[in-house]
Amino acid sequence: MPDFIALTRDVLEKGRSVRFQVWGSSMTPFIKDGDVITIVPVSAESDIGLGKVVAFLHPWLTGRRLVVHRVVGRRGSSFLIRPDHALGHDPFAYKLCDILGRVVRVEISGTHYSSRFRQGREEIDFHRR
């Protein structure tokens, strides 16, 4: 049986989106434990910009976990990425090949609504489910 990361990577490499429930508090209040996100594939550096929220393989966590954090800058050909909930921490640098996709939708428990997030951040659809 294929693991979640292999399956996610395979679907994204075929140009399809992936939707799954997240856990953890590193992106609160933007994305909370239990929210459902949709990520789309990225194929070029132009797909990833300042303020975008990306899903990437964290190389230092056990089992190279899939993690969702925000792009906060660039260093050469690397993207500087860090969680929203840890603004005091220095960002880590990741290459394009480490980034699997970009978050384009967040679903929150409850009734349906839609809005756009601005002020230098990725415009993402929010929906209550």
PLM feature segments, named:
Residues M1-R129:
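Extended hydrophobic leader/signal-anchor segments used for secretion and membrane insertion
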